[in-house]
């Protein structure tokens, strides 16, 4: 009689976290400050060939999205193509700062980024 035991160093069901080869300069702890003038930024995932939008929140409230590859928030646009995520943020002409949080998913791997745009200079 013999007994065999198997042990895995990777727990079953846990995916590798998403890793990024390209991120915008200024990204700190998942948050990016954006000037009132707006702009665009690019993220490139190096360990997943594709991923999709899991959720979008504006000022803490979930927004309804019908596409997993593109989201138009009116003052910002999120586009995913293959392993790249592009964010375009329009000029803020209001006297209030604004923000949105984007959660992306690749199977059981998730990542979240918050974008905070400055108010227009009066």
Predicted regions, residues:
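Eukaryote-skewed repeat-based solenoidal scaffolds used as protein-protein interaction platforms
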Residues: 26-29, 35
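A short beta-strand micro-motif common to beta-rich folds, especially ectodomain repeats
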Residues: 94-108
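Generic structural detector for well-ordered beta-strands
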Residues: 33, 44, 86-88, 103, ...
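A mature extracytoplasmic/lumenal domain signature
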Residues: 47, 91-93, 106, 119
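Bacterial Sec-dependent N-terminal signal peptides
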Residues: 1-27
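C-terminal edge beta-strand
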Residues: 17-20, 84-85, 108-122
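Surface-exposed binding patches on compact interaction domains or structured appendages
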Residues: 20, 31, 38-86
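Short, solvent-exposed, Trp/other aromatic-anchored flexible loops in extracytoplasmic proteins
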Residues: 84-97
């Amino acid at each position: 009689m013999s007994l065999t035991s198997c042990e895995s160093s990777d727990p079953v069901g846990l995916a590798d976290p998403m890793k990024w080869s390209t991120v915008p300069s200024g990204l700190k702890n998942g948050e990016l400050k954006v000037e009132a003038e707006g702009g665009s930024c690019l993220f490139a995932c190096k360990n997943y060939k594709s991923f999709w939008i899991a959720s979008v929140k504006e000022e803490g409230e979930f927004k309804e999205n019908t596409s997993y590859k593109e989201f138009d928030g009116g003052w910002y646009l999120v586009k995913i193509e293959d392993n790249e995520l592009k964010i375009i943020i329009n000029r803020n002409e209001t006297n209030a700062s604004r923000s949105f949080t984007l959660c992306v998913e690749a199977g059981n791997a998730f990542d979240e980024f918050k974008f905070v745009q400055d108010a227009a200079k009066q």
